[in-house]
């Protein structure tokens, strides 16, 4: 079949307003990547298929846009609010800093609209008398979607005639104004732009100082802590792990977040010493928000790529009452990726409905859910069996959902009450079967777990003055559980119960947190948090305090301290052993507890360039460990525990995080972040060891460049690169004698030297290349995203080779490439 590529490119050039040469350059780039990535999947004409699909949609559906000349325009809308009370600020000035005359005044409800904004990058400034100006820099404006901004302004603590004008940008600090150190706001736009982000917020934060990334998993290890010690929050509610195939490869992680960047709003990420409103977390908190849909017009997105299909839509439910909806659905089968080990199918759905009223406050209905299915490959040719795992066949089905109804009511312009009633659900149904050389099967593992949480949470926020703001909150979580895990101790032996339980219990928590402006330069954040687990009546009271000093308009110093605690996964409390029969051996376990101390130094080199240095130390105590053993939950990565534990372990993490960042300006941004740390723990044997996640160092380098192309400079070519150098995986020396004496030759380790060995450092490279074509009311984007193009290997342990009689390293180099086409209209 012959195709006239020149003629096709001419049509695209006419439709997009891009010169023929530029179209040819972009096409060759995508054609090369497509042919390399898709040819091995037998898609010979993959490049042509994607090109023709884009061309067909562009020509047949949006042909009416041809003939329109000039740079496409868009509208920037939003609201200006008080950063402490969240109440709208009427009659504030909002303008585009680089466009003369593009300014407006907010109405009586704090709303603003700036029409006729050319596509491209723009900086939005908001100002009001008595407040420090707020700046949102380099906002990406496209032709297909309106931009909606929520701009918080901080009221000055001084009298009007003493106000020092100090503009605050949207990326310099967390959205939560009571955060003192260890906090970072991340935007949805960054998630789609940063190399290696894969539109996944969990992978995005791996670029930040203090976080050690993985390739095969998006588990978040902060300062050497295990990923399961992080808390996931959505709309102010703790939710189950929101990742696809959660907790299978790494407890606390998965392969990809179910929360799409299509529906996420700006969120906060904490790496330590977080404020009093956050509890039941030891290492950090990922506080995510869903954005409201456009309440003025319908907007839609369709994305097709190797990883699957993605459909999103938003718009008004009632223009009269300003109600809106937004949803996103995604389906993928990684059979397209030709992954070794099995086939993964997953899908997810996210939504939010927003209903503002004139007198009764604002109601919202929100939710997220996922369905995952995994089937392992099984080699039926017994001559190809090299390892014990080659004889096993496994299955896995997972379900997760979280949703709720939230209500916010303003009593006046300085006090509000937000209440949420929510429910979460998670289910894991899995099993594994072993085959002998006669192809006779015996069950090796059987798992069926269901967890349902009913949650009531309420927060009262009051701004007493420009110096003093207080938040008080209460949360009641009723937890229903049903779990049944059985594992065969050895091959061909009957299954034995590992954990089993059915019932319900409650976690009750409350907090009080205040922010006090002592002077214009000194701010004190202090509070207290407490929680009670009714399962065993264990409780904890935790003070938090932070002090921030604005030494100069460019220099800040901060110090924060806090106590923290976290309950274990529910299955841990119901572990059963042979000696105890039906008695649960861990039911009286106390919380894992920690104390964080963090210093912070920030220097604003210029309006676009920041330096931040944060040394820290964390002490962990009452850590569940196994008596007379090196085992500790601080190293836990498996989805189950099968031993009796006691709260006699300790841990210590000490290090320093450094970030040097240049925000996007004139199409260029870059960031260098580094972390040097030492993470150690004391087991039940009283000996101190390296933790499993003690890589010692992580260095990230990010850089990206954008070019405006096309006749009217309305199209955007973006190239982004990320390189990560980090210490290698840790492991324990092999106990060869114990391994050879094991009935199944399962590799045994010398636990007296736990995690004393380390593999070579890892160099992980990621890239993102995209080209966006902006037409009137429609936008096309072609993107190629690569993960681990450097081929860094991750190590998963060791396996006994039945053919050679030797023990081999189990490792893998996961390399992913996603080629996609996105249509916004």
Residue locations for each model-derived region?
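Short, acidic, small-residue-rich periplasmic hinge/interaction motif at the N-terminus
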Residues: 65-69, 73, 79-85, 92-97, ...
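Short acidic/polar hinge/loop motifs at secondary-structure boundaries
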Residues: 115, 239-269
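A beta-strand signature from Gram-negative outer-membrane beta-barrel systems
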Residues: 255-299, 310
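Gram-negative outer-membrane beta-barrel transporters
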Residues: 617-619, 640, 644-727
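C-terminal beta-signal and adjacent terminal beta-strands/loops
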Residues: 724-746, 760-766, 771-825
